[in-house]
């Protein structure tokens, strides 16, 4: 399950999305809602989310400022913007901060579910790659003593060139 934070200054929008989205079926857990970006930042500094759904126009800290903050401070958090503004500048900024999707209001539950499904596939892929890298790193670390031993044997037997020695010294 991926944790989602919903950020929108309109209570009706927060309520509609919260209640009409089948979070668990889609592989998500709604960790909460916030009415502006400032509240979201405070929440995200306390508890990590995997995905933030945010509006753009909100008081105090708007959705673009929130997106920039997440891009700079919480690199792993993905963002979907749900906005009533069809402005090219917003879209350009969203691309700059690697927003996963930019959805225009009004949005149906079906459209949101399709978007969440696509994003979940990307999140699953990233999670798999991280776990695969972790597994490979673990295997390398457990075999490192053997690799060092083989290298030492090669050194003692004189089977290693100067350049290979330099490369192996960096690795081991």
Q: Where are the regions that the model predicts?
A:
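Interdomain helical linkers/hinges and coiled-coil/dimerization scaffolds
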Residues: 107-172
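Short amphipathic alpha-helix used as the core "switch/output" element in two-component signaling
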Residues: 42, 64-75
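Acidic catalytic/metal-coordinating carboxylates
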Residues: 36-39, 62-65, 83
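Receiver (REC) domain active-site loop signature in two-component systems and cognate sites
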Residues: 58
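Acidic, metal-coordinating helix/loop segments flanking the phosphotransfer/catalytic sites
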Residues: 33-51
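Active-site residues of response regulator receiver
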Residues: 8, 55
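Two-component/phosphorelay signaling modules centered on CheY-like receiver
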Residues: 11-32
């Amino acid at each position: 399950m991926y944790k989602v934070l919903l950020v929108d200054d309109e209570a009706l929008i927060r309520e509609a999305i919260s209640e009409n989205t089948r979070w668990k079926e889609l592989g998500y857990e709604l960790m909460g809602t916030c009415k502006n970006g400032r509240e979201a930042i405070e929440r995200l500094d306390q508890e990590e989310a995997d995905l933030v759904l945010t509006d753009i126009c909100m008081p105090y800290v708007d959705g673009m400022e929130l997106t920039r903050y997440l891009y700079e401070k919480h690199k792993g958090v993905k963002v979907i913007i749900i906005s009533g503004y069809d402005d090219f500048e917003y879209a350009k900024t969203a691309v700059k901060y690697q927003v996963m999707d930019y959805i225009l209001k009004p949005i149906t539950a079906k459209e949101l579910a399709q978007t969440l499904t696509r994003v979940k596939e990307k999140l699953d892929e990233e999670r798999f790659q991280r776990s695969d890298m972790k597994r490979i790193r673990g295997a390398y670390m457990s075999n490192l003593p053997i690799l060092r031993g083989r290298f030492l044997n090669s050194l003692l037997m004189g089977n290693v060139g100067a350049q290979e020695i330099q490369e192996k010294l960096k690795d081991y």
